[in-house]
């Protein structure tokens, strides 16, 4: 069942259009080298991050991490496909993919989600599949 141990989280994920803004944000962060955004007040949040936070605030706390994991997985696949089209080296892809998960891990804290501060994604970097 992928990241969704709870069927209702899968439903929330679909209703939230797969956290579209979060996916775009994760994608953007993955493509930028350097460290991701530090937790900031809402004033300094880029609009896209703000949209992503809004999406996460609509989830039940229980579903925040599973839906984020689903979004991360989707972005990972996009990046992998793009990388193959551009003939990217595996190592660069791994960096980008690990940045997706780094960014996603801290999103609940960046977004001040109640009762969720960090999503414990496994840092296991799967080899090229």
Swiss-Prot record:
The keyword Transport does not apply. Keywords: Allergen, Disulfide bond, Seed storage protein, Storage protein. It comes from the Eukaryota. GO terms for molecular function: nutrient reservoir activity. Residues 32-47 have a biased composition (Low complexity). Residues 28-47 are annotated as: Disordered. The keyword Glycoprotein does not apply. Disulfide bonds: none annotated. This is a 2S seed storage protein. The mature protein consists of a small and a large chain linked by two disulfide bonds. Belongs to the 2S seed storage albumins family. This is Allergen Bra j 1-E.
